[in-house]
C-alpha cells in the first residue's frame, strides 16, 4: 500500500482538499490563486499537504508550499504530512523543507514506524531509516561540538580570571616576551659568533675592572702564605 486511505476524506465538500485527493494540479492551482487557504483542514485536522503527501503527489505538495502551506502542520492525532508519506520523492521534499524525520505523533510513532505498519515498499523504508540515522549522527555531532565550545569558553574564562587576579604576572610575561624578541633580533643582526665574541670581551673587561678596583684577581687564591 503506497498511501494512507482516509475514509472521511475520500469525499469532502472543501474543493481544495478534494482537488488534493484527486491529484488535480490545475484545479488546485486555480483555487489557490483565487485565495483559498492552503492550510484549510478536513474533519480530522488534515491539510491539503497531508492528503497530497499521502497520495505521493509531490507536484501538489510543492504547489501548496509555494502558496504558504505549513509543512509542520499536524492533524488531530499529531501526524505531520511526513507520517502519511509512502513515496521517496515526497519524503525528500518534506524533509528538505524542515520536517524532522524522527518527529513523533501523539502515540509516539515516527514516520518510519507508520510506514512499516502500512507495508510501504522497501525503497521508502530504507530512505526513512537512512534519514533517521543521519539525524542521530547530526545530533551527536552537534552535542559534541557544544561540549567542546563550553569547555573552551570555561578555559578562556579561567585564564582571563587568572590574569585579572594576577596583573603583575601578565605584565611580567609581556616584558619577558618583549626581551626575548629583542634578543633574537639582536643575535640575527650581529651573527652568533660575533655575539659570542662580544660576550667574551665583556667578561674579560669585567674581570679587569674587578682587579683594578680591588687589587685582587678573581678566581685566584690571594691569601698570604704562612711565614716560617
Curated annotation (Swiss-Prot):
TM stretches of this protein: 195-215
Q: What is its main location?
A: membrane
Matching InterPro entries: Ankyrin_rpt, Ankyrin_rpt-contain_sf
Q: Name one GO cellular component term.
A: membrane
Which segments carry the ANK repeats?
A: 11-40, 44-74, 77-103, 107-138
Q: What domain of life?
A: Eukaryota
Protein name in the entry: Ankyrin repeat domain-containing protein 46
UniProt organism field: Rattus norvegicus (Rat)
Which taxonomic lineage is given here?
A: Eukaryota, Metazoa, Chordata, Craniata, Vertebrata
Amino acid at each position: 500500500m503506497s498511501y494512507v486511505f482516509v475514509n472521511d476524506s475520500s469525499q469532502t465538500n472543501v474543493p481544495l482538499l478534494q482537488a488534493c485527493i484527486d491529484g488535480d494540479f490545475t484545479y488546485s492551482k486555480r483555487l489557490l490563486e483565487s485565495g483559498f487557504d492552503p492550510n484549510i483542514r478536513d474533519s480530522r485536522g488534515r491539510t491539503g499537504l497531508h492528503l497530497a503527501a499521502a497520495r505521493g503527489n509531490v507536484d501538489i505538495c510543492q504547489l501548496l508550499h509555494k502558496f504558504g502551506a505549513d509543512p509542520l502542520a499536524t492533524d488531530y492525532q499529531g501526524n505531520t504530512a511526513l507520517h502519511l508519506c509512502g513515496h521517496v520523492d515526497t519524503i525528500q521534499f518534506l524533509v528538505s523543507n524542515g520536517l524532522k524525520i524522527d518527529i513523533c505523533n501523539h502515540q509516539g510513532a515516527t514516520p518510519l514506524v507508520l510506514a512499516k505498519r502500512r507495508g510501504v515498499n522497501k525503497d521508502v523504508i530504507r530512505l526513512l531509516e537512512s534519514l533517521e540515522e543521519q539525524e542521530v549522527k547530526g545530533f551527536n555531532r552537534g552535542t559534541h561540538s557544544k561540549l567542546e565550545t563550553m569547555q573552551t569558553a570555561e578555559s578562556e574564562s579561567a585564564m582571563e580570571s587568572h590574569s585579572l587576579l594576577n596583573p603583575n604576572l601578565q605584565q611580567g610575561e609581556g616584558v619577558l616576551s618583549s626581551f626575548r624578541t629583542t634578543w633574537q633580533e639582536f643575535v640575527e643582526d650581529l651573527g652568533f659568533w660575533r655575539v659570542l665574541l662580544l660576550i667574551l670581551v665583556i667578561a674579560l673587561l669585567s674581570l679587569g675592572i674587578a682587579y683594578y678596583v680591588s687589587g685582587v684577581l678573581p678566581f685566584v687564591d690571594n691569601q698570604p702564605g704562612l711565614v716560617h
